């Protein structure tokens, strides 16, 4: 009986309507720019919030901020050193910055940790620059053997 009373109370709450204008330039951001600002704000209070870091890394990369994306990916790999997806993302960040040796090191680590999505690997535009290197085919063959 008490639960019904609580539910009835919650359903009958009416919040007041306020009209106001936010003049802060931060709230004038849109799209990826707003997303980045918002996620950075969350990380100020929770610097090791992995899901937030993952979204922020993706947002940086989508916005062409590859150096910042790389820093996030490195941080994520230190927080979760056994996650193959994080090393795959690290490889992508290095590849976008044309850090070829570092990209191959991270990609090899991802594969050693269990990354095996050849379909995605072969189509990922972030890795385009790596496909010209003989090491790329060797890593693909390594995945196929497992």
Residue ranges with predicted function:
Residues 21-29, 117-142:
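TPR/TPR-like alpha-solenoid helical repeat scaffolds
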Residues 20-29, 35-98:
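Alpha-helical adaptor scaffolds
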Residues 101-118, 140-146:
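TPR/TPR-like (Sel1-like) alpha-helical repeat modules
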Residues 1-34, 145-146:
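Long, contiguous interaction/recruitment modules in multidomain scaffold/adaptor proteins
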Residues 36, 70, 104, 131, ...:
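Conserved positions within tetratricopeptide repeat
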Residues 59-62, 127-128, 146:
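A short structural micro-motif
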């Amino acid at each position: 009986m008490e639960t019904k009373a609580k539910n009835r109370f919650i359903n009958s709450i009416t919040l007041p309507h306020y009209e106001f204008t936010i003049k802060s330039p931060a709230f004038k951001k849109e799209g990826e720019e707003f997303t980045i600002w918002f996620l950075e704000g969350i990380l100020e209070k929770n610097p090791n919030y992995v899901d937030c870091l993952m979204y922020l890394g993706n947002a940086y990369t989508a916005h062409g901020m590859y150096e910042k994306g790389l820093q996030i990916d490195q941080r994520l790999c230190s927080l979760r050193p056994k996650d193959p997806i994080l090393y795959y993302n690290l490889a992508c960040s290095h590849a976008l910055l044309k850090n070829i040796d570092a990209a191959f090191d991270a990609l090899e680590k991802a594969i050693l940790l269990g990354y095996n999505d050849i379909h995605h690997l072969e189509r990922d535009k972030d890795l385009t620059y790596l496909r010209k290197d003989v090491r790329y085919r060797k890593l693909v063959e390594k995945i196929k053997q497992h």
